[in-house]
């Protein structure tokens, strides 16, 4: 297994974790409660949401760093931090670098949420969707072998990225539609929302990604 292969696997794992993170964040944003939906199961949704973000951030940073140990890739530190000078596929590499920097902002501001205030945190938290978009575009278009070959959209790795992207898009659409229906339900007295998390419980945690409601 080459350094390029390891870098590719790190990137794919980060992408899957980010997908899980976004999906869990969307559930948190509607105050979904697994305990109420499945009384005999206690799923730590906040822990899952936080740790998938932290591990994904580490893997996104590791993903290009591994290329420093590849004689074929010919990447330098500066190429990783500023991909406009990278050996090839500069635009796609820039997408990946921007995703890392935005993800770093989202995670750091989540730690500082109480200091910066909820309104600013919530606004910055929406950058998570930009992170996801950049990751999916980067993962779909870049050549995993770094040979500038045309994209094979039916390649196994590409299909995985495409499916994750479509899943997140579908979940966001459902979330938006639900937001409209919930707004309409609020106007009707006696509507039950027993399967949502208590608002105080949501606000007492600091989720790392995509849980802004």
What annotation goes with each model-predicted range?
Residues 1-213:
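Membrane-embedded alpha-helical bundles that constitute the cytochrome b-like, heme-associated redox core
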